[in-house]
């Protein structure tokens, strides 16, 4: 079956979504990321894999962790990194997305890292590059609308593998605003592909997408029930900027029912880890005692994200 992310040899040429990628490619990325962890421990944190290549960061939405870690990752691969200031670019004057891409291609771009509010924007760019015969230029999706955030999903998988080793023995809970979360979608596809036997979605009915059961996900509206005996708890923030209409009574009411407190975390396994893609809203989806506690691996997630993004860019570029 045709997959726009793969070249004619079945190798990863763009990373647009975790969905549809074979398990072997996910493991290739995770294994490559593990090898890059050593680079971050060196005095000189550089490898020459993208020397002479130009990486353009195109962030049409705000970002701290993702944009910064992509920039660090590209520089550690020895790439030349160009951060396009969208507010000062011709895009703010009405230039179309594909016209922007064509102009950057004329500047000898090799790889685009794209975050966009519109679902499917990275696919549009990848298809355009193929149509104009630029198979030598690669696209990495850094988050598109509510659709996907594949590198966040992959760094979450790396974090889980680092602490739990065997995916096939795990019970993983994803808690919060799953309806609007591109991270949740990427995590669910990655977890099921890697063989996690039980993925749980916990949240109010208004914040859970329909048909999660068709993805093999177990749905819980009671957080206490959903957390029982879980090995991994992934907390999500409320995506207020993507909500239309009143989906929640109040932040305080939400915290009472779905905020992760030490008491609720105690229902999971004693060695359960707590993850969060950031930014965190303390006192809304997570209590500070949990966020700063011994079971939280939120800051290691950020560290692992550099190695994972190094792996993704290196692999799509043909290394």
From Swiss-Prot:
Pathway: Pyrimidine metabolism; UMP biosynthesis via de novo pathway; (S)-dihydroorotate from bicarbonate: step 2/3. The keyword Protein transport does not apply. GO terms for molecular function: amino acid binding; aspartate carbamoyltransferase activity. L-aspartate binds at residues 93, 182, 237. Carbamoyl phosphate binds at residues 65-66, 115, 149, 152, 278-279. One of its GO terms (biological process) is 'de novo' pyrimidine nucleobase biosynthetic process. It catalyses: carbamoyl phosphate + L-aspartate = N-carbamoyl-L-aspartate + phosphate + H(+). It comes from the Bacteria. InterPro entries: Asp/Orn_carbamoyltranf_P-bd (IPR006132), Asp/Orn_carbamoylTrfase (IPR006130), Asp/Orn_carbamoylTrfase_sf (IPR036901), Asp_carbamoyltransf (IPR002082), Asp_carbamoyltransf_Asp/Orn-bd (IPR006131). Its EC number is 2.1.3.2. GO terms for cellular component: cytosol. Keywords: Pyrimidine biosynthesis, Transferase. Belongs to the aspartate/ornithine carbamoyltransferase superfamily. ATCase family. Heterododecamer (2C3:3R2) of six catalytic PyrB chains organized as two trimers (C3), and six regulatory PyrI chains organized as three dimers (R2). Catalyzes the condensation of carbamoyl phosphate and aspartate to form carbamoyl aspartate and inorganic phosphate, the committed step in the de novo pyrimidine nucleotide biosynthesis pathway. This is Aspartate carbamoyltransferase catalytic subunit.
């Amino acid at each position: 079956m045709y997959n726009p992310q793969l070249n004619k040899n079945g190798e990863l040429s763009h990373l647009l979504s975790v969905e549809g990628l074979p398990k072997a490619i996910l493991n290739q990325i995770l294994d490559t990321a593990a090898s890059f962890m050593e680079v971050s421990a060196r005095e000189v944190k550089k490898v020459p894999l993208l020397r002479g290549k130009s990486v353009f960061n195109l962030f049409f939405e705000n970002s701290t962790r993702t944009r910064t870690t992509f920039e660090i990752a590209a520089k550690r691969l020895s790439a030349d990194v160009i951060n396009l200031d969208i507010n000062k670019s011709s895009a703010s004057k009405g230039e179309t997305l594909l016209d922007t891409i064509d102009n950057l291609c004329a500047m000898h771009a090799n790889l685009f890292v794209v975050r966009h509010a519109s679902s499917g924007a990275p696919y549009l760019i990848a298809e355009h590059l193929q149509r104009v015969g630029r198979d030598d230029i690669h696209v990495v999706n850094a988050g598109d609308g509510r659709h996907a955030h594949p590198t966040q999903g992959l760094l979450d998988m790396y974090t889980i593998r680092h602490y739990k080793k065997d995916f096939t023995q795990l019970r993983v809970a994803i808690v919060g605003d799953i309806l609007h979360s591109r991270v949740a979608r990427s995590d669910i596809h990655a977890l099921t592909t890697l063989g996690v036997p039980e993925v749980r979605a916990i949240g109010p009915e208004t914040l859970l997408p329909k048909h999660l059961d068709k993805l093999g996900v177990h749905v819980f509206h009671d957080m206490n029930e959903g957390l029982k005996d879980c090995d991994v708890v992934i907390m999500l923030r409320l995506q207020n900027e993507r909500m239309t209409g009143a989906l929640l009574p109040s932040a305080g009411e939400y915290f009472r029912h779905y905020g992760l407190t030490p008491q609720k975390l105690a229902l999971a396994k004693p060695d359960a880890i707590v993850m969060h893609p950031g930014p965190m809203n303390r006192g809304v989806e997570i209590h500070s005692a949990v966020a700063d506690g011994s079971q939280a691996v939120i800051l290691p997630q950020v560290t692992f994200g550099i190695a994972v993004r190094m792996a993704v860019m290196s692999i799509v570029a043909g290394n």
